Regions:
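A mid-sequence interfacial segment
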Residues: 102-115, 318, 322-328, 332
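Long, charged alpha-helical interface segments
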Residues: 156-157, 161-173, 177-185, 295-315, ...
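Extreme N-terminal starter segment of soluble prokaryotic enzymes
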Residues: 6-11
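Amphipathic, soluble alpha/beta structural segments
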Residues: 328-345
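C-terminal non-catalytic interaction/assembly regions of soluble proteins
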Residues: 240, 252, 257-313, 319-324, ...
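Conserved mixed alpha/beta catalytic, RNA-binding, or beta-rich assembly cores of soluble enzyme
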Residues: 14-32, 39-58, 62-107, 112-267, ...
């Protein structure tokens, strides 16, 4: 199960006041580069939930909690696959994380939406209320696939009980992104690191007593579009802002990507050298043929280069089959940045 940020959101409301709130909320969410698409639905709640439940990463329900619970009860399957569900009253007093707080990202989205609406966030998951990080939150923050998510509960219980958990990594690979994250975020958790040569370099194993959680490191690809002559510093300014929005370290990046028309662009080549990560220049034919509902095409780019998207499409193509955008195309003074995460299995 790949854990990554919420990208596609549906907002459902039942009253006129709730609908007006959904329009306001969509306005806020559309300005957020980490939210790829937001759609609005009104009334016919039960049928709408049936149709949407597994089509979106998150569903925000502006309605009484009783209506919400009765509507979603028959649809809930598992914390591994259920979408994030948020509940907001029509006066926007409270934003409640209702389902899939960690794995689905409801807690994180609740904080974001509450901030947008100047509302009170309501989060009830035990690790959060005790100011501790769950292992599923660590995986989510670092864009790791959890291979055996049923084990998560044992690790989060251990963390709540102040018991030690061990992160085991391959001794031949660089995991600075993990070490930096643990140093900065796990002051309340008893954590140690073990090195071995016996596990795959793209895996992190987390150990507690006789339990083992396997996390796979997915590729994070930066798609770049830019005007001719933009320097590596110009591109880096945009990239730094995107990484700050996503709370990702440069050390977590796997590849850069752009269209082959940019293969001699000094700024991109220099940035690749500086970050010490490869760059993939995608053939223009592939960019032209590539279709994804995530892509936000530009008529200007299409008129100039014959393709509707460079940064988003090159990131998704380079990240591979079933990859997802985690940062939609955003312009930074002649530079466009998009990020995609792979799904290797």
């Amino acid at each position: 199960y790949i854990i990554c940020d919420i990208m596609k959101i549906a907002i459902i409301s039942v009253s006129k006041k709730g609908y007006e709130l959904s329009l306001l909320l969509k306005e806020h969410l559309d300005k957020d580069s980490t939210i790829i698409n937001t759609d609005i639905y009104y009334k016919d709640v039960k049928n709408t939930f049936k149709l949407l439940f597994y089509e979106y990463d998150a569903i925000i329900a502006i309605m009484a909690s009783g209506i919400l619970i009765r509507s979603i009860a028959p649809l809930i399957k598992s914390k591994v696959c259920d979408p994030a569900i948020l509940n907001i009253d029509e006066n926007a007093n409270f934003v409640i994380s209702t389902l899939s707080g960690h794995l689905g990202g409801a807690n994180k989205l609740t904080s974001k939406v509450a901030n947008m609406l100047n509302a009170t966030e309501v989060i009830t998951t035990a690790t959060d209320v005790n100011k501790k990080l769950g292992v599923d939150v660590i995986a989510k923050d670092l864009y790791l696939t959890v291979k055996n998510p049923k084990e998560i509960v044992y690790f989060n219980k251990a963390i709540l009980n102040n018991e030690e958990i061990i992160f085991r990594v391959n001794s031949k690979e660089n995991y600075d992104f993990l070490f930096d994250y643990l140093n900065e975020n796990t002051l309340e958790i008893d954590v140690s690191i073990e090195f071995t040569s016996s596990i795959n370099t793209d895996e992190i194993h987390v150990l507690y007593k006789n339990h083992k959680l396997i996390m796979k490191i997915e590729d994070i690809v930066v798609g770049i579009g830019c005007r001719r002559g933009k320097s590596k510093e110009d591109i880096l300014t945009g990239l730094d802002k995107a990484l700050d929005d996503l709370n990702i370290s440069k050390k977590r990046l796997s590849k850069l990507a752009s269209g082959e028309i940019k293969k001699e662009e000094t700024g991109i080549l220099d940035l690749s050298k500086m970050l010490n990560i490869p760059v993939n220049f995608v053939e223009m034919d592939k960019l032209t043929l590539f279709k994804s509902e995530d892509i936000h095409e530009s008529e200007f780019v299409k008129s100039k280069f014959g393709v509707g998207s460079v940064s988003e499409a090159s990131a998704l193509i380079t990240a591979g089959f079933d990859s997802k955008l985690i940062y939609k195309k955003t312009a930074f003074d002649g530079v466009t940045i998009a990020l995609a995460v792979s799904k290797k299995d």
